[in-house]
A protein has these predicted regions:
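Gly/Pro-enriched, hydrophobic low-complexity segments
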Residues: 102, 126-131, 135-210
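Acidic/charged, solvent-exposed loop-and-adjacent secondary-structure segments enriched in E/D, K/R, S/T
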Residues: 93-119
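N-terminal mature ectodomain segment of secretory-pathway/periplasmic proteins
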Residues: 23, 27, 33-88
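Anionic-ligand binding region
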Residues: 115-120, 127-131
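Bacterial N-terminal signal peptides that target proteins for export
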Residues: 1-9
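A mature extracytoplasmic/lumenal domain signature
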Residues: 44-46, 68-70, 76-80, 87-90, ...
Length: 210
């Protein structure tokens, strides 16, 4: 799984209106406990530091839909078509240009990943250490540190605004940071019974690495 896809299994959100003075941690816990599904749009960028200068690069964008626990559709629309979809048991990664599908069991891999914050169960503090991180850029921030030392990510920063997650900054074990902006988030939309069922595209090559 390439770096872009790893970062992508990282983000989606939910909402609940809370008091304006509530801290990021209270806002986020209320958001998580009150929302069983959500949809919206995302913009994803990577942070690069060259000669001491910080730049944002590799912009990608698309839409997302999720339902707890472990079901989601994360669709890249620009600059290319790629799909990450999970049905609660398996994760499907579809590259439209290659007409190629890679499948993996969700298993325990979800528990300490950024995806667990958005798509997993409500028991966040089992897998993450959470703490307030102050205010910046008009948002209240919290930090989530995975308790699993084998996690791909070392720190996840979440920006909350008016009871909604608006930004996730993901720092991986190589020191690289991916920023995901969340827009037009809608809480608890109506879902079809087979909303997250993945259908293998005609003629697609299917890989099942273990």
């Amino acid at each position: 799984m390439n770096a872009v896809l790893k970062s992508a299994i990282a983000a989606l959100l939910v909402l609940l209106s809370v008091q304006a003075e509530a801290g990021a941690l209270d806002q986020f816990k209320s958001f998580v406990s009150s929302t069983h599904a959500a949809k919206g749009e995302f913009i994803q960028r990577q942070v690069k530091v060259t000669n001491g200068e910080t730049k944002l690069s590799n912009q990608a964008s698309g839409t997302f839909l999720f339902a707890r626990p472990g079901k989601f559709i994360w669709l890249y629309q620009k600059p290319y078509d790629q799909l990450l979809q999970a049905d609660g048991e398996k994760l499907y990664m579809y590259d439209k240009d290659l007409n190629q599908v890679t499948t993996k069991l969700l298993g325990s891999a979800l528990s300490s990943s950024p995806a667990a914050i958005l798509f997993g169960s409500n028991d966040l503090e089992t897998n993450f250490s959470l703490k307030e991180a102050g205010a910046k850029d008009g948002m209240d921030w919290l930090q989530a540190t995975p308790k699993d030392k084998d996690s791909t990510f070392t720190l996840i920063s979440i920006g909350m605004q008016n009871g909604l997650p608006r930004e996730m900054d993901l720092r991986d074990t190589f020191g690289k940071t991916t920023i995901i902006l969340l827009q037009n988030v809608e809480k608890n939309p109506a879902l079809k019974a087979d909303q997250f069922k993945f259908v293998i595209p005609a003629g697609a090559d299917v890989f099942n690495p273990q």
